[in-house]
């Protein structure tokens, strides 16, 4: 049975984490996706920016292959790291205001 090649136009229509996982043929755990979907998508966004910067002359097929690898990497990252550890979102990067940390008192 022959499958049709994925296109960049199809890729651009994807919206949900599950859509990307199915598009790239990545097996996934729905419970895991439910908990980590925003973090997976945010990490994937960062990774495709890196792919685009590192490989500007890739063909559509090659780019989609790299994007698939990037999505799988983003998905796998949160199996071993927590969102707090990865600090993808601004809320995790900012220091709380009006808070003094104990380590700051010992300086």
From Swiss-Prot:
Q: List, in alphabetical order, the GO biological process terms annotated in this UniProt record.
A: nitrogen fixation
What superkingdom heads the lineage? Bacteria
- Keyword Transport attributed: no
The protein's UniProt keywords, in alphabetical order, are: Nitrogen fixation
**Function noted in UniProt:** May protect the nitrogenase Fe-Mo protein from oxidative damage.
Family assignment? Answer: Belongs to the NifW family.
- HAMAP family annotated for this entry? NifW
Q: Tell me the subunit arrangement.
A: Homotrimer; associates with NifD.
Q: What is this protein called?
A: Nitrogenase-stabilizing/protective protein NifW
């Amino acid at each position: 049975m022959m499958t049709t090649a994925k296109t960049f136009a199809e890729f651009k229509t994807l919206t949900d984490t599950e859509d990307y996982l199915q598009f790239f043929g990545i097996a996934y755990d729905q419970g895991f996706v439910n908990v980590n979907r925003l973090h997976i998508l945010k990490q994937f966004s960062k990774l495709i920016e890196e792919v685009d910067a590192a490989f500007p002359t890739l063909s559509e097929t090659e780019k989609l292959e790299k994007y698939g690898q990037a999505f799988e990497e983003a998905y796998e990252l949160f199996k071993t790291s927590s969102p707090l550890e990865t600090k993808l979102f601004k809320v995790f990067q900012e220091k709380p205001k009006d808070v003094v940390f104990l380590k700051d008192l010992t300086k």
